[in-house]
Amino acid sequence: MDLVLTLIAAPNSNALGDDIVARAKTVLAAAGARVGDVLWLAAGEACDIGFAGLSLDIADTALRDAGLGVDAVTQTAKTRRKKLLIADMDSTMVTGETLDELAAFAGVKDHVAAITARAMNGELDFEAALDERVGLLDGMSTDMLAEAWKEIEYTGGAKTLVATMKANGAFAALVSGGFDYFTGAVRRELGFDFDQANVLITQDGKLTGKVQKPVLDRQAKVDALEKLTAEQGIGVEDAIAVGDGANDLQMISLAGTGVAFHAKPAVQEQARICINHGDLTALLYLQGYAKSDFVI
């Protein structure tokens, strides 16, 4: 079977039962596919179903219409294992938005968070929204960066994703429209090989309310993907990209496997692969790793 459907439920939920698997097989067969055997990647959590004779677009539509209640991702089986991970940081590798947490120390978190939400949904120009939010932090002590970092939590599966891919020879890159203070911390703690982000301009131990130009925007993420794959001697088809915001869309679209992870509505409308139930270990299941293969 040259194609594979991967079904993924929330971790440790035991929500993926034989009934859902049987329904998925029936949906594929009814759409005209030849359906193969089931390979369990994690009991009650993730499995592969091989199939052939059906386009991915038709399979995706049929599975989406079926409303299985789990993540259902189709792809070509032969090329699923990737050699490079390129990941967004905010609301992807970490659960929140680092700029919003920083804004809390200036008493403007709600205002900044509202702008962030609109920008990440593609409703506002990214650079203009970034400048406006950073401008509200003018005069803040740089000591607050460390305080904001204390409020940040890693997304479930983040460390396992990076460690497992690296143990299997992949290169791991963190590329964010956030700030290098935070991406540096994430790189060190999770084991990323590389990080790139925006730079807050400081003077005399205080934020100036400005960010170094040019900003790292959606095009910069695409440029990073192309540069990193070239440096590794591989193609963009050998990369798996993950993000949640509008500024991740081009990167997600270009990578061999592009994942919208618990993403904003506008992003989910355009991305082919969406993960809404699983945590970041879903990206390992998508590549054919079984839970027993995970490096914790």
Task: Kindly give the residue locations of the regions a language model identified.
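Exposed alpha-helical structural elements
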Residues: 23, 58-62, 111-114, 125, ...
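Alpha-helical substrate-recognition element adjacent to the catalytic core
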Residues: 32-50, 74-80, 92-200, 204-205, ...
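Residue-level marker of motif borders
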Residues: 83-85, 117, 239
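Conserved strand-to-helix beginnings and helix N-cap segments that scaffold or border functional pockets
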Residues: 18-21, 99, 159, 264
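Non-catalytic pre-domain segments flanking phosphatase-related domains
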Residues: 1-87, 295-296
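C-terminal cap/substrate-recognition subdomain and adjoining C-terminal extension
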Residues: 139-140, 146-257, 261-296
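Asp-based phosphoryl-transfer active-site loop
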Residues: 83-98, 247, 252
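A generic alpha-helix structural signal
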Residues: 25, 60-63, 116, 149, ...
